[in-house]
């Protein structure tokens, strides 16, 4: 079966042929490759072609595909039961690993997706603050719950407008949209809605408008505003937690959040996410408090076992993030040099094992900046790299990831492919 045939078959039964829209290659053109299996740093499609994978399941696989330790933990757990629907010491073990690492987190609760984590964190934050207003930032993605699917309408101080079909305006009326890395836009919302804002949520390292880190000064001023107006600050680290560093984004800004959300890496590739923070807020959750949150598969033993194996392996390797960042910098430096040689302007960014690039002549600080990137050039580059066996994120507004299964030789392979690709698309 060819990739085209497999994708055509998928479209008969699955909307758009995919279970998450970006996988359909809509923004880069062509049809997606259909994956048969994966191992280490590589994907293999149904036609037998091999790809160096810089997506790594959109971030979770920090050790690459089929890591032996995580694989063995999952297999062992399956033999003891895939789900109990009851408490298990494995939940406590993973919770302790995370709380011990992140000192601002007193307690944590597990869920099955990043969307659940952010949705639940916002609910308990509102329950604690007793105010409904929520500030989010343009370009930050916090999952697909209704209240967070908004874009800027007539400015940062107005109510948000739904940016997805099926989202009633009443659902987003308490969501206010601010500009990333622009503290004045946040001040204006607080000043104009002094008694309404109970929650602020932000990706400290945004990964869904490309890779765009928040400035240290901006985050510190955001913390001060939340304290001044009595709002709960949530740092969404579903992507950056245990990815940008062992402490997520914290070493880059040293700002303490009230709540933090996690996902991806903490599950070792399984469907695990979490939200945690100060005990006085987390104790508002049922059964101790009045804020209800639940999940059939939350904390299931297979996922917990994978997470324990992943975090334990991270903690046992003091040089892990040094190696990963070195490879990420080598890749982005290689892309810059290759683009320069072809007369193409590119901006790059690295945070630990995360990387991103924009085809623009200015530094990207927010969503409007990101939108000015040359997405047509990005699409051509993606197609040219895919043809050469390099699997990059099929959207300008996503982030790439390095895994520990990659070697310097793998990075050299990608850089050499980029040299050829840039010359091809420039011709």
Curated annotation (Swiss-Prot):
Which pathway does the protein contribute to? Answer: Porphyrin-containing compound metabolism; protoporphyrin-IX biosynthesis; 5-aminolevulinate from L-glutamyl-tRNA(Glu): step 2/2
Q: Which UniProt keywords apply?
A: Cytoplasm, Isomerase, Porphyrin biosynthesis, Pyridoxal phosphate
EC numbers for this chain: 5.4.3.8
Q: Where in the cell is it found?
A: Cytoplasm
Q: Which GO terms describe its biological process?
A: protoporphyrinogen IX biosynthetic process
Task: List residues modified as N6-(pyridoxal phosphate)lysine.
Answer: 264
Does the record's keyword annotation contain Isomerase? yes
Task: Please tell me one Gene Ontology term that the record gives under cellular component.
Answer: cytoplasm
Q: Which reaction does it catalyse?
A: (S)-4-amino-5-oxopentanoate = 5-aminolevulinate
Recorded GO molecular functions are: glutamate-1-semialdehyde 2,1-aminomutase activity; pyridoxal phosphate binding; transaminase activity
Q: Which cofactor does it need?
A: pyridoxal 5'-phosphate
Q: Which family does it belong to?
A: Belongs to the class-III pyridoxal-phosphate-dependent aminotransferase family. HemL subfamily.
Q: Tell me which PANTHER family the record gives.
A: GLUTAMATE-1-SEMIALDEHYDE 2,1-AMINOMUTASE, GLUTAMATE-1-SEMIALDEHYDE 2,1-AMINOMUTASE 1, CHLOROPLASTIC-RELATED
Q: What subunit structure does UniProt give?
A: Homodimer.
Protein's name in the database: Glutamate-1-semialdehyde 2,1-aminomutase
Q: What is the scientific name of the source organism?
A: Campylobacter concisus (strain 13826)
